[in-house]
Amino acid sequence: DDYPYTSEGVYIYYSGGTVDVATGDEVRVRGTVSEYNGLTEINASQVLVCDSGKTVTPTAVTLPVDSLTAFEAYEGMLVTFPQELIISEYFNFDQFGEIVLTSERHMTPTAVYEPGSTEYQAAALAYQLDKITLDDGRSASNPDPALHPNGAVFNMDNLFRGGDKLANVTGVIDYSFNLYRIQPTEGADYISANPRPAEPEEVGGTLKVVSMNTLNYFTTLDDGVNDICGPDQLQECRGADTLEEFNRQHAKLVAAIVEMDP
């Protein structure tokens, strides 16, 4: 409808089997409009392909946005970010393939301002308005292989670091798990902007300080069956879900510690 506050796209949920569709197809959909965990979708009873070979021009979107609900107007649409975006967070990259992108680097508000202060609140809001989550287009947990945001496999020859940049990020705006996110339709242009130092600057000292965050490394298994732990045996166990997952975690941690060579 070309109204700026409503989306020109919508997600289609179809449980009636597979439909032979491709990018550029024109389809006719019959179904019921619904909200699924905050995502507007059509629960389709029928999907028919009417034509093919159509082109869709992605809508340009930039960060920061004006409001926390600004991406609602692009939900289900193919969009592109013409600006360079910074890789600001990747805590969920290994488990869910998620990377948080911003237009500039943001300090943790409490590292700069007094908690609860006006300045703190302004900085926290500025970050929320300046971020979008880049997903990997998959729903798997602990995906193997992981995908680099450039679309290729993530490995030791194709890495990224916080502070590196992406250009021409293009995909469909999605909403799930309380986040607006981009489901990419193509790899972004990767720019190495924050290379890892070969070694720390010389400070004249003789001591080395090393650390390793092992995250949820427990020898107990959270397998949903025998996962009763704690001093009083009243808590669920923490750690990997299976022995195979634990062995994978163990091997990765040992290799990382050895590579540090403290």
Task: Go through each PLM region and give its residues.
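Extended non-catalytic accessory segments flanking core domains
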Residues: D1-E236, E245-V258
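Proline-aspartate-enriched helix->loop->beta-strand connector
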Residues: D261-P262
